[in-house]
Amino acid sequence: MTGLILAAGASSRLGEAKQLLVYQGQSLLERSIRLAFSVCQEVVVCLGAEVKQTVSIIEKLQKEFPSLSYVEIENWEKGMGESLSVGLKTIDSANDVLVLLCDLPFLTNAHMKNIISLANPERAIVASFQGVNSPPVLIPSALRPLFKNWSGDQGLGKFWRLNPMLCEIIHFSDKFRDVDVPEDREYWGI
């Protein structure tokens, strides 16, 4: 299983790169990489905005995680769908892929383990936090071709809305609160 972290965005609503924000002593990007490696053998990070700073975080972590790599998304401004499509193409087509975002500070290793415990070769496993569906999402290799032409602002939400029969929802009691606007920084103490 390969982890795919979507971390290419410019964080325009926040006003600064959320990948670089520090929470509990780690950048949100480092935190996401460590979460992914708690269940994945390799991890690919999609980069776009703030490439130099994010690459330095990745290079530091490659000493600990040699199977950590990154891909620069040429058209990252187009949206999450672009990162998802390009990122998936860099991963062996036989691999299941766990897709994560780097702006979800409430995620834990336990969430990751619960998600992969439901792995199903024919269905995506979608996390839901108090009714809000969100990555992490486990995409089995059999469903990866459905994302071949994903582009622009097509996030994963479109997938589970259009393909409910191909998805299994795992419900968590945690409140969904990502880091998108300055008030979220305050909430998380970042």
Which residue stretches match the model-derived regions?
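N-terminal/domain-start segments enriched in small and hydrophobic, helix-friendly residues
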Residues: 15, 30, 144-147, 183-189
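Short, well-ordered alpha-helical scaffold segment located
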Residues: 111, 142-143, 175, 184
